[in-house]
Amino acid sequence: MSSETVSYFSHPFPRRQSVGVSVGGVIVGGSAPVVVQSMTNTDTADVDSTVAQVVALHRAGSEIVRITVDRDESAAAVPKIRERLERLGHDVPLVGDFHYIGHKLLADHPACAEALAKYRINPGNVGFKDKKDKQFADIVEMAIRYDKPVRIGVNWGSLDQELLTTLMDRNQAEGAPLSAQDVMREAIVQSALISANLAEEIGLGRDKIILSAKVSQVQDLIAVYTMLAQRSNHALHLGLTEAGMGTKGIVASSAAMGILLQQGIGDTIRISLTPEPGGDRTREVQVAQELLQTMGFRQFVPIVAACPGCGRTTSTVFQELAQTIQEDIRRNMPLWREKYPGVEALSVAVMGCIVNGPGESKHADIGISLPGTGETPSAPVFVDGKKVATLRGPGIAEDFQKMVADYIENRFGLGRKIAS
């Protein structure tokens, strides 16, 4: 195995060097960890609903939240949303998502321009023909005036058609023309880079610019961001647009972003999931955290390992216990982060039979091996690799939950610090 291969799989992974950008105090790029962000789907003019969803997203772990600013009523609501969030103790940076009339909204609502931590600009619809550069410049000048960063967010569904047509015509004149897909990828990259260069010419510093180039296909996303990473040192926002619902959206986003992150590309991510009707918007935050944690980039919540089950595990007790422990951890993490510093590194194992159960449980900080089919109805518990107890009877689940809570208190709690 070559030294280059060893380096590629080492930890930490080699990270592309980008220019760091402060978004309301959250650093994106540079040497900062990859940041998790999300977006509301409420009507921003509805202050109560928007505040409630931002709070839920922030509690779930979103470090930046984007909101739609599409009309006067939405822009007027932004300062109220910001004020309400601060009163509730949620000082999460808000990003204004602007399309078509962002230049006008920012000019007409200075309190909105001030309250937002970042402006998102789409070069494909900021203006058309002779108005495009002027309206783009207006937003950039607002960012300079209020000392705000911008994300220049190209999207293949609203790609600058003039640029695409120019590149298509130029490609046809070549002796060996590229495919239409390759030309589209190049147009997306050029749209982002041309816009970034224009913003810098107007006077916006590179430490105020984040780029994104979103498409809906995995291979396109990998190609486009690889090209951007090679041709720029701007901070990059990763995201697969129109990823879809449920498992499909999770798999597509994880496949694309996992490859890019492994290559050191990406400074902030958003998993754009289509929620089920009545579904939980915070799911996208959880998936983003799990992607980064699974790849070893960050730690957000304790890991609960559980076996998949087989013919030896006809009982559902281990599945129910694993789910209960995971839900309990998620529910308590906002408090635990404050009360138990370092608890994110905890690992818990809930196993279903004797084959791998004891071994897996020993590798976790605290683990339990529940009895499988035909096995003695007892469950050994391991703490820091050593067997410390054997649980029996109908209260195994409740007893183990208490042991987990006691372990967290003893290892991460204030009493441990005083004793040390």
Curated annotation (Swiss-Prot):
Enzyme Commission code: 1.17.7.3
GO BP, one annotated term: isopentenyl diphosphate biosynthetic process, methylerythritol 4-phosphate pathway
GO molecular-function term, one example from the UniProt record: 4-hydroxy-3-methylbut-2-en-1-yl diphosphate synthase activity (ferredoxin)
Textual note on the cofactor: Binds 1 [4Fe-4S] cluster.
Keyword entries, A-Z: 4Fe-4S, Iron, Iron-sulfur, Isoprene biosynthesis, Metal-binding, Oxidoreductase
Listed InterPro entries: Dihydropteroate_synth-like_sf, IspG_bac, IspG_bac-typ, NO2/SO3_Rdtase_4Fe4S_sf
Positions with a binding annotation for [4Fe-4S] cluster: 307, 310, 353, 360
Coiled-coil regions, chain positions: none
Keyword Acyltransferase in annotation: no
Pathway(s) the chain acts in: Isoprenoid biosynthesis; isopentenyl diphosphate biosynthesis via DXP pathway; isopentenyl diphosphate from 1-deoxy-D-xylulose 5-phosphate: step 5/6
Entry's transmembrane regions: none
Name of one Pfam family that matches: GcpE
Gene3D superfamilies: Dihydropteroate synthase-like, Sulfite Reductase Hemoprotein, domain 1
Catalytic activity as recorded in UniProt: (2E)-4-hydroxy-3-methylbut-2-enyl diphosphate + oxidized [flavodoxin] + H2O + 2 H(+) = 2-C-methyl-D-erythritol 2,4-cyclic diphosphate + reduced [flavodoxin]
UniProt superkingdom: Bacteria
Cofactor(s) needed by this chain: [4Fe-4S] cluster
Known function: Converts 2C-methyl-D-erythritol 2,4-cyclodiphosphate (ME-2,4cPP) into 1-hydroxy-2-methyl-2-(E)-butenyl 4-diphosphate.
PANTHER family, sorted: 4-HYDROXY-3-METHYLBUT-2-EN-1-YL DIPHOSPHATE SYNTHASE, 4-HYDROXY-3-METHYLBUT-2-EN-1-YL DIPHOSPHATE SYNTHASE (FERREDOXIN), CHLOROPLASTIC
The family this protein is said to belong to: Belongs to the IspG family.
HAMAP family tied to this protein: IspG
Protein name (Swiss-Prot/TrEMBL): 4-hydroxy-3-methylbut-2-en-1-yl diphosphate synthase (flavodoxin)
Annotated organism of origin: Brucella suis (strain ATCC 23445 / NCTC 10510)
